[in-house]
Regions:
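P-loop NTPase switch/coupling surface
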Residues: 1-193
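Extended helical coiled-coil dimerization/tether regions that scaffold
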Residues: 2-18, 161-281
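Secondary-structure boundary elements
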Residues: 22, 244, 248-249, 297-304, ...
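Glycine-rich, often proline-containing surface loops adjacent to acidic residues and nearby aromatics
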Residues: 25, 46, 301-309
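Short, flexible loop segments at the rims of nucleotide/cofactor-binding pockets, characterized by
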Residues: 29-30, 281-283
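Catalytic acidic motif of RecA-like/P-loop NTPases
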Residues: 50, 310-314
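GG-anchored amphipathic helix commonly corresponding to the ABC/SMC/Rad50 NBD signature/C-loop
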Residues: 67-70, 267-276, 282-307
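A short catalytic or substrate-binding loop motif that flags glycine-/basic-rich loops and adjacent residues
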Residues: 91-96, 259-262, 284
Length: 315
């Protein structure tokens, strides 16, 4: 993207009102007690785009997990939960529970504050987070009514977890076993494991090729269960941005979700002027960029978009 285009986007966003032009906009998040954060650490979201930067272990992902739990039907405990090896401190010396407070603008443009606490659910789940009435201990006015959790579509793309269909099988096997996969990963085993997996991929890639070339739409497996979804053709706008980000000129591309290699996963196909290739011959940054651009250009308006570990893959 040219500097002029970036500047134009920033100018447009600066002219927009966070309270009027963005539905249920999260304007601030505060952490009375959260992980190893300093008490009442606060982040203001005074611009629609926020980039969290810092060394490893400074809490960037932890902030994303909290924001993920802000809208209704989403829960921070899906990503941060207690185990025998990594227990979570229930409360600090002042009896303040693990918590965060986020501020947002309601439909009338009025800023509201909502407290979220990590509590024991009715079903006995200790990793459940629930909104709470305002409590003085958490810096809120108890006389104020409890707002409802914001109703907002959310998309969380954590690129640490995005693995292509090819990489899932080649590095972890059909059942995700690691015993031989680790040896393969570090070059300690180049015989049977390599040969078995290459033979399997060569055989099953014929099915993938048939779908990518449009010869077949859906391939059924045992009991007539579909082994893939319909291939998605990337739009001209998607191809433009993928080319811009990666610095190559692509003419077309496809995304397909399938289980030809044993487990469900995504494959991509990118075509340049004289050749095309799948994620098997693409870098992890190419694969991640295709999914990122496709998802961002197809989300609903006023969605909360959280991106984790993006720069690591685009370096």
């Amino acid at each position: 993207m040219q500097k002029y285009e970036i500047g134009k986007c920033i100018t447009t966003l600066n002219k927009m009102s966070l309270s009027r032009d963005f539905k249920n906009y999260i304007s601030k998040i505060r952490f009375p007690h959260y992980k190893n954060f300093e008490s009442n650490t606060t982040i203001d979201f005074s611009f629609p785009l926020t980039v969290l930067v810092g060394k490893n272990g400074t809490g960037k992902s932890s902030i994303l997990y909290a924001l993920y739990g802000a809208p209704k039907n989403s829960n921070t405990g899906n990503f941060w939960f207690s185990t025998a090896t990594d227990p979570i401190e229930e409360q600090d010396e002042n009896k303040v529970r693990q918590s965060f407070v986020y501020s947002f603008f309601d439909e009338n443009g009025i800023e509201k504050n909502l407290l979220n606490l990590r509590i024991l659910s009715k079903k006995g789940d200790p990793n459940y987070w629930e909104s709470s009435r305002p409590v003085k201990l958490y810096g809120l006015d108890p006389s104020q009514p409890r707002p409802k959790k914001i109703d907002k579509n959310i998309i969380f793309l954590n690129f640490k977890s995005i693995i292509s269909a090819y990489d899932k099988f080649f590095y972890f096997g059909r059942n995700g076993t690691k015993s031989s996969s680790q040896k393969l990963l570090y070059g300690q085993e180049t015989g049977r494991v390599y040969n078995d997996r290459m033979r399997f991929i060569r055989r099953k890639s014929k099915q993938l090729d048939s779908v990518l070339n449009g010869n077949t739409t859906i391939i059924n497996g045992p009991y007539k269960k579909p082994q893939n979804s319909k291939a998605i053709k990337l739009s001209k706008e998607e191809i433009y941005w993928i080319s811009d980000i990666l610095g190559h000129s692509y003419s077309s591309g496809l995304i397909i979700n399938h289980k030809f290699y044993g487990t469900w996963g995504y494959s991509i196909y990118l075509k340049q002027a004289n050749f095309g290739y799948t994620e098997a011959h693409a870098g992890s940054g190419e694969f991640a960029t295709v999914l990122l651009v496709h998802d961002l250009l197809n989300i609903n308006e006023n969605s909360l978009v959280l991106l984790g570990s993006v720069l690591k893959l685009l370096k």
